[in-house]
Each structure stands twice: as structure tokens, then as C-alpha cells.
Amino acid sequence: MRKLLSHLPIDTFIALLLATVAVAALLPAHGVGAPLAGAAATLAIALLFFLYGVRLSPQAALAGARHGRLHLLVFLSTFALFPALGMAARALFPHLLTPELWAGVILLCVLPSTVQSSVAFTSIARGNVPAALCAATLSNLVGILLTPLLAGLLLSTGQAGGHGGISAHAVGDIVLQLLLPFAAGQALRPWIGGWVERNRRVLGVVDRGSILLVVYAAFSEGMVAGIWHSVDLAMLVRLFVVNAALLAAVLTITTQVSRRLGFSRADEITIVFCGSKKSLASGLPMASVLFASGAVGLIVLPLMLFHQLQLMACAALARRYAAGQTTALPVGDSVPASG
């Protein structure tokens, strides 16, 4: 089965997420099972961020300080360009999506970059891999604090379906479920970091299993609350268009700005891939902490769709970069936004 899935155009983990959504739709947790699923999801989120804390190396982030301009551009793309585009899209087309889906788009826009796929695609494209590792690591370290703050600020300005910023209760949850476990992981990294790295494959299963549990709990609550009547095929198509437009805009802007600022081809590749990624692994648990439980299932839909889009688009773009490594593309060339 795994070999079969590997040949499909859809990411294997996305297939597992969709299967989890289907299970939640058919067999949602309710009655006594609902609080049990919620408690298990809470523990899973804390475990995820503890493991993130153990894995992320502050030294790796600081090691790339000499690439200051590169890191600044990645940071601005991740935490300024994306949010600006998302807010502009919502302001121009407020009725294109439901308030919950727009809240999900804004959350997507303020998430940190990914580490694994950013580095992997940079490597495939023959880019600056050490700088990619530093930039993506720094993005995740900063995102632990900055993402909730930006989400609260931007969602409070647009009245996205009542998602008006972060409540005091949500602040407490952020501290208990995200910051404290992450800080504990960072503190214990010198002692258990090596063990975690050696057992990365096994703990990767724990990571993904925890995320699937969070998704099951979120979608179960959405089913019980009856929120899914607002989503039909036409709405999903519009969401796809919004996500594709966001990704295409960021890929194009980061490419053109990198070239006009005189970055090398290797650094351009790093900026494009690190600056256009959004972390599914961070976003799903963060959404469960930041938003009312019944709406989380809808709010994470934009992120789940964007994750698949970014993998397909960046796989095609990485192959294009690798094929043309000896001759830089002219500044006027367009960047493919999808595979």
C-alpha cells in the first residue's frame, strides 16, 4: 500500500489526513468519547511541541548569521508578505469564502516555514542547504511566539466570523500546550537530543500519529456541531483558487526580489523555497489551541490544501532549478505555481 501511495500525485501524509477526516465524519467522537478525544489531543499537542523543542537547534539558527540579508528576506516573506497578501485577499473578496475559511487562510499566512521540506527541496534544486537549514530553523523558533501574536492581531482587525483575536483562555493554552513543552524540549536537548535524532524514524511516526489525533478530534467536534453544511464543492474550488494565487504570488515575488537584490542562484533557491513554505505540523496543533473547538475543522482546511499545493509546486520548481543549474534563468522568466 505504501509503495502504491508513493506513486500517487498526492502526498502520503495528506492521504492519511483525508482518511482521518473520513473516519471523523463517519465515526465522530461524541458523548463520553468527546472529552477523551479532546484530552488526548491536548496531550498530543504538548508532546509535539516538546519534540520540536528537542529537535530545533538554536546553534543551527545562529550559525547562519553571516547570511543576514538572506534570512531577513525569508523572514519578511514568511511573516510579512504572506500576511499582507492574505489580508488583501480577504479585504477585496470578503464573500468569496466563509468567515471560518478566511480565518484559516489568515492563520496559514502567519505560520512559520517548514524545516524538512524546505531543506529537501533546496538540496534537490542545488541551493544553499546550510542557509536553508538555518533560515527554516530560525523561522520555527520565532514562529512559536510570533504566529499566535500575529493571528490574534490580524483576526481581531477583520472580524473573521467572530474570530476576534486571542482570548485570555487561549493565551493560557498557548503557554501550557505550546511554549512550556517547547521550552522544556530546548532545555533537555543537550541530554536527549542525540537519542531523539537517532530514533528520528520512530519518533516521526509519533509526530504524525499525534497530528492525526488532533485532526480527528477537531473534525469530530465540527461534525457534532454541524458546521460542515457551509462547505460545498464550489466553496472548495474557490478555496483552491485562493491558495494557488497566494502560492503563485509568493513564489514569483521571492524569485524576482532575490534576483533584483543580486543574490546568487544558490541563495535565490534557498529564499524561494524557505520563504514560500508553511508548516502543516505546526499549524494543525496551533489551530486547535487558538480557535474554538467546533470551528477548527473548517479553519485547518486551507492549510491542508495549501500543504499539498506547495509540495506539488515546489517539486516541479526544484526539478526546473536542478535542470538549469549551469545557466541562470532571465529575470523576466515566470515561476511555475503548480506541478
Regions found by a protein language model. Give the residues of each.
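Membrane-interface helix-loop-helix junctions at boundaries between adjacent transmembrane segments
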Residues: 90-146, 151, 155, 160-170
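Membrane-embedded alpha-helical segments of transport systems
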Residues: 15, 77-85, 110-115, 131-154, ...
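Hydrophobic alpha-helical segments embedded in the membrane of multi-pass proteins
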Residues: 112, 244, 248-250, 267, ...
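Structural signature of multi-pass alpha-helical membrane transport proteins
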Residues: 1-93, 152, 156-265, 325, ...
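Helix-helix packing/entry segments at the starts of transmembrane helices
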Residues: 200-206, 263-279, 285-286
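C-terminal transmembrane helix pair
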Residues: 280-339
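Helix-loop junctions at the membrane interface of multi-pass solute transporters
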Residues: 63, 116-128, 229, 256-259, ...
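The feature identifies polytopic integral membrane transport proteins across all domains of life
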Residues: 68-75, 96-110, 127-137, 236-240, ...
